[in-house]
């Protein structure tokens, strides 16, 4: 099975070490462009762009990097409850057209109640998933060309529609990650690809089985992906030394403050990440070559595959055997590590190389819209 390998744009910061300004790197547009172009040339299929108040806006970052890349796809965040699903569908179609079909979308319900309240979203965990289901139902149908009336508990629209369709038909794929039962129910009904953070293979297998069963009950099939950091070197010894070096500036106080901050999250996935290490830096290899050191201070994906190329490839294949076909990798610093992954890991995997993007023609091939709502009358060509 050919694997889709994505990279990551560190719009929330980058550097050689975690938890310190030592070795930190300024992340500006020029640096993000370097990473995106490297990923494009090295054969990564796409890049995940993170979302949240600690990050640059993922949509604007993607739009700014489309003109300087050729094949790379951009996985950007949809935020239910923060934006109208109809407006989000229009934005998604525009990004897909401007990128010639290189737009992918990642549904993010959010897991930090404090940040969500600051964004104006005052829903508890269950309510957020209710709203996310409603949002996604509308978003999908509008992108697929339907005129939508929807009267939900959280969202109501009447006559919602899209005038300019996306390049990808019937619409761009939807990705989503979540570990709660409500999240799995949403994935089973709504998404093309279910993402998990890098838990041990046995835990990942259990989640995949649960989502598969739920999807089958609705007559659907779902693809699977995983989000992991990678520390790959020419030897296993060098890789583990690099892992130790990455957290060499972390002190106990920084770890304790980070874990206290992350503990306020109501994200089940975040709780599962934290439980892998419990803030203890002495037992970080939680499964063979799966290292939880990143999660001592980083929210979200907190584990890394560590080893030489053949060793990391063997672990990747273990996940692939569970049914995972998409791997979203990252590493510190992200520019250099993109080369290491491509040079040391790719040769040991069957990596699906991206094709040249489609040509979109014109955004509006039929002239100006009549009264902002009606397609101009078609004239037969003789």
Swiss-Prot record:
Signal sequence range: none
Catalytic activity of the protein: an alkanesulfonate + FMNH2 + O2 = an aldehyde + FMN + sulfite + H2O + 2 H(+)
EC identifiers of the protein: 1.14.14.5
Pfam family name, one: Bac_luciferase
InterPro entries assigned: Alkanesulphonate_mOase_FMN-dep, Luciferase-like_dom, Luciferase-like_sf, SsuD_RutA_monooxygenase
CDD domains membership: Alkanesulfonate_monoxygenase
Domain of life: Bacteria
Any one GO biological process: alkanesulfonate catabolic process
GO MF annotation terms: alkanesulfonate monooxygenase activity
Record's keyword annotation contains Zinc-finger: no
UniProt keyword annotations, A-Z: Flavoprotein, FMN, Monooxygenase, Oxidoreductase
Uppermost EC category: oxidoreductase
Induction trigger: Repressed by sulfate, cysteine, or thiocyanate.
Key word Flavoprotein present: yes
Main function: Catalyzes the desulfonation of aliphatic sulfonates. Seems also to be involved in the desulfurization of aromatic sulfonates.
Further information: FMNH(2) which is absolutely required for this enzymatic reaction, is provided by SsuE.
Annotated family: Belongs to the SsuD family.
PANTHER family membership: ALKANESULFONATE MONOOXYGENASE, ALKANESULFONATE MONOOXYGENASE-RELATED
Protein name in UniProt: Alkanesulfonate monooxygenase
Taxonomic lineage of the native organism: Bacteria, Pseudomonadati, Pseudomonadota, Gammaproteobacteria, Pseudomonadales
């Amino acid at each position: 099975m050919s694997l889709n390998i994505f990279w990551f744009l560190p719009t929330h910061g980058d550097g050689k070490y975690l938890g310190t300004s030592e070795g930190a790197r300024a992340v500006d547009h020029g640096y993000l462009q370097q990473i995106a172009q490297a990923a494009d040339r090295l054969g990564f299929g796409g890049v995940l762009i993170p979302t949240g108040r600690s990050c640059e806006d993922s949509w604007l970052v993607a739009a700014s990097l489309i003109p300087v890349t050729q094949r790379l796809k951009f996985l950007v965040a949809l935020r239910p409850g923060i934006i109208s699903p109809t407006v989000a569908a229009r934005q998604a179609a525009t990004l897909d057209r401007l990128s010639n079909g290189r737009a992918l979308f990642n549904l993010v319900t959010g897991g930090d109640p404090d940040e969500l309240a600051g964004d104006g979203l005052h829903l508890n965990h269950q309510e957020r998933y209710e709203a996310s289901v409603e949002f996604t139902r509308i978003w999908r149908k509008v992108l697929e060309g339907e005129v939508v009336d929807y009267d939900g508990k959280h969202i109501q629209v009447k006559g919602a529609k899209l005038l300019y369709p996306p390049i990808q038909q019937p619409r761009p794929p939807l990705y989503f990650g979540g570990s709660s039962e409500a999240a799995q129910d949403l994935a089973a009904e709504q998404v093309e690809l279910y993402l998990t953070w890098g838990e041990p293979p046995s835990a990942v297998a259990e989640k995949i089985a649960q989502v598969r069963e739920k999807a089958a009950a609705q007559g659907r099939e779902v693809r699977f992906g995983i989000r992991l950091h990678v520390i790959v070197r020419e030897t296993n010894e060098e890789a583990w030394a690099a892992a130790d070096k990455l957290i060499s500036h972390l002190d106990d106080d920084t770890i304790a403050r980070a874990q206290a901050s992350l503990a306020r999250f109501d994200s089940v996935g975040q709780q599962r990440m934290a439980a892998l290490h419990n803030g203890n830096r002495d037992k970080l290899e939680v499964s063979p070559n799966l290292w939880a050191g990143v999660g001592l201070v980083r929210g979200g994906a907190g584990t890394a595959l560590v080893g030489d190329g053949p060793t990391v490839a063997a672990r990747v294949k273990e996940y692939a055997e569970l049914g995972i076909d998409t791997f979203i990798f990252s590493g510190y610093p992200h520019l250099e590590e993109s080369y290491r992954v491509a040079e040391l890991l790719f040769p040991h995997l069957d990596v699906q190389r991206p094709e040249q993007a489609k040509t979109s023609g014109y955004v509006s091939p039929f002239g100006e819209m009549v009264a902002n709502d009606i397609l101009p009358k078609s004239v037969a060509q003789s």
